Amino acid sequence: IPFGVLPDKVLVNGPDYGLGLKYVLEEVGPSLRYWKLFQVKADPSKGDIILVLLPYWDRTINNILNLIKQIDWPAEIVIKFHPTVEQSKYTSQIPSKFSVTDKDLYYLFGRARMVVGQSTGTMVEAASLGIPVINIVDPEKISHNFMPEFGRELLWSSATHVKDVYRLVRQFEESIRLDPSQLVGMGEKMRNNYFCEPTEETIVRAFGLT
């Protein structure tokens, strides 16, 4: 490679993250950071919480907290802040009927009936486990949507206003009631498209350790 500027190989998390590079070898590599995603099982039909995953942008946090307070949810609201956020700044905005947790994300996925949030890759992880995801969009600000096109309107969807959230809650509750296995099946397909299990075989192959 001239000047040694380009890498010999680029590893991506999954087949659908392909960059279409012309001059550099591109391969799917093990998703080392997401190894727990392949260990946990989720069943939204048995979920007993609505998991709210907050990003680290102040305006976005305020928008989500303001919106979720206006919804009559079908399960307990459990809020997980981004680890870089000072939670005490938002205490006054969280009703006593909601709870805040610092428990392991994958433990919470195992209890989740739905996941609500914005601009965080953890929502892709949730959908990959077959958990319905509501992506909150701020109408007055550019929103970073990490969700892939796959599963839109079936496994995940975006909401801007309270009425949008209510519609999606009803839709996802019906999906959970009628055919939760379909959600799990779509989740498995998403996981296979966007993540690669870090097994000994995939690690050896990706890093040429043979």
Q: Which residues make up each language-model segment?
A:
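Donor nucleotide-activated moiety binding/catalytic core segment of transferases
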Residues: 83-129, 133, 140
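Conserved catalytic-core segment of nucleotide-activated headgroup transferases in glycan assembly
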Residues: 26-93
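Catalytic binding pocket for nucleotide-activated donors in carbohydrate/polymer assembly enzymes
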Residues: 5-7, 23-24, 28, 94-95, ...
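Structural motif
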Residues: 9, 49, 113-114
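Active-site and donor-binding regions of nucleotide-sugar-utilizing enzymes
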Residues: 1-37, 123
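Helix N-cap/beta->alpha junction signal
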Residues: 13-16, 83, 119-120, 161
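Short, acidic/turn-prone active-site loops that include or flank metal/cofactor-
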Residues: 16-17, 31-35, 102-106, 138-142
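C-terminal alpha-helical cap of glycosyltransferases
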Residues: 177, 192-210
